[in-house]
């Protein structure tokens, strides 16, 4: 990165449009209507906690509402303009300013870029949150609104949360906060109590697939777009990450190996490990590990009696039932937790990723073969 380049943004997914640049929000009409009704009633709450799984449009909705408020300023102006949704035309000056990140009445808080270390800081720091003091203390421009968007609150530590709590406790006039949280239960109860919670739900697979188009640099065919949408479990962000990381092919390779448990094809295992763990393949690594975790979650749900999801590889459903019965549910939950710990420790210690992949499949092989081993010893 050159010195003249803008700093990377932790709330941007790859090369895809940032939520502030996104004009269309699919599948969240109920949440959008709730915000519109609150504003038009003249009783707009000063702080909103937008919750739900990652990648379903929470930040996109926050910026969409911010543009609407900055464009109209008051319910009377919005009503006179005939507003029936939160849409702001892309050629409107407010849209262009917000998209460029240059609107003076919006403050975006996220994990900052550490220029010295050339990476994002691990938390949304207290210094970032304290920027709200000066921002909300200044005079607002046209419309009189000042809007803070926190993406994501999950990244805050205790000090950051306490700094946010102070501004939420004494909100300035015509101030709005949109607090994006994927796991709101981890936030301080006092923060949650000062916000109005707006719960957003995963999108339908068809809505996710509709976003996987040329505008997001997705070149997959219709069947593959729908498969990625289903794998994403209703998250546009995850679907785009799966596309960027070659996730559909990775998932098929992973499942092909898993279907052979309790035996492993060592040659194919090493091919998969090389693909995921090669230097510079960060997207493939993240996507592959996430998809393996998803598969284990589905295995546990299958063992608990939940209906199986649509299969992406022929015979996947039957194989998952067989494996769920090959060991106790507790053993599968235990190995899932151990794999999560192994990956976290490997990232912290910069362990050889190929060794991590081989160890993961060795653990799975051991659990899948435990039932057969018990029968043999009996």
What label would you give each PLM region?
Residues 137, 162-176:
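Conserved catalytic/switch belt of AAA+ P-loop NTPases
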Residues 142-147, 172-178:
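Loop/turn-to-beta-strand initiation segments
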Residues 116-126, 153, 197:
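Flexible beta-alpha connector loops of hexameric P-loop NTPases
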Residues 51, 150-151:
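Residues at the beta-strand->loop junction immediately N-terminal to the Walker
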Residues 126, 158-159, 189:
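Conserved D-loop-proximal element of ABC-family nucleotide-binding domains
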């Amino acid at each position: 990165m050159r010195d003249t380049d803008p700093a990377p943004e932790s709330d941007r997914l790859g090369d895809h449009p940032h939520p502030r640049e996104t004009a269309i929000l699919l599948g969240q009409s109920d949440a959008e209507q709730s915000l519109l009704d609150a504003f038009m009633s003249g009783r707009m709450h000063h702080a909103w906690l937008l919750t739900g799984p990652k990648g379903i449009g929470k930040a996109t909705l926050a910026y969409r509402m911010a543009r609407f408020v900055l464009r109209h300023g008051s319910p009377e102006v919005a009503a006179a303009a005939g507003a029936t949704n939160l849409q702001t035309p892309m050629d409107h000056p407010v849209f262009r300013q917000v998209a460029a990140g240059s609107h003076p009445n919006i403050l975006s808080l996220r994990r900052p870029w550490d220029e010295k270390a050339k990476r994002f800081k691990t938390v949304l720091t207290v210094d970032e949150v304290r920027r709200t003091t000066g921002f909300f203390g200044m005079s607002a421009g046209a419309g009189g609104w000042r809007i803070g968007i926190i993406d994501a609150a999950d990244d805050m530590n205790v000090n950051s949360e306490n700094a946010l709590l102070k501004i939420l406790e004494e909100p300035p006039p015509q101030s709005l906060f949109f607090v994006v949280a994927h796991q709101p239960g981890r936030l301080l109860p006092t923060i949650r109590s000062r916000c109005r919670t707006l719960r957003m739900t995963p999108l339908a697979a068809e809505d996710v697939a509709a976003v996987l188009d040329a505008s997001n640099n997705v070149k997959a065919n219709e069947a593959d777009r729908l498969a990625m949408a289903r794998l994403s479990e209703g998250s546009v962000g995850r679907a785009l990450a799966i596309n960027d990381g070659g996730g559909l092919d990775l998932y098929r390779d992973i499942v092909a190996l898993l279907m052979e448990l309790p035996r492993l094809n060592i040659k194919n295992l090493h091919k998969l490990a090389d693909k995921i763990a090669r230097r510079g393949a960060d997207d493939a690594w993240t996507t592959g590990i996430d998809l393996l975790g998803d598969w284990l979650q589905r295995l546990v749900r299958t063992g608990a009696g939940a209906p199986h999801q649509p299969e992406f590889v022929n015979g996947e459903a039957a194989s998952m039932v067989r494996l769920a019965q090959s060991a106790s549910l507790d053993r599968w939950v235990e190995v899932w937790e151990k794999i999560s710990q192994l990956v976290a420790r490997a990232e912290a210690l910069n362990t050889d990723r190929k060794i991590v992949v081989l160890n993961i499949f060795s653990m799975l092989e051991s659990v899948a073969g435990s039932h057969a081993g018990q029968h043999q010893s009996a």
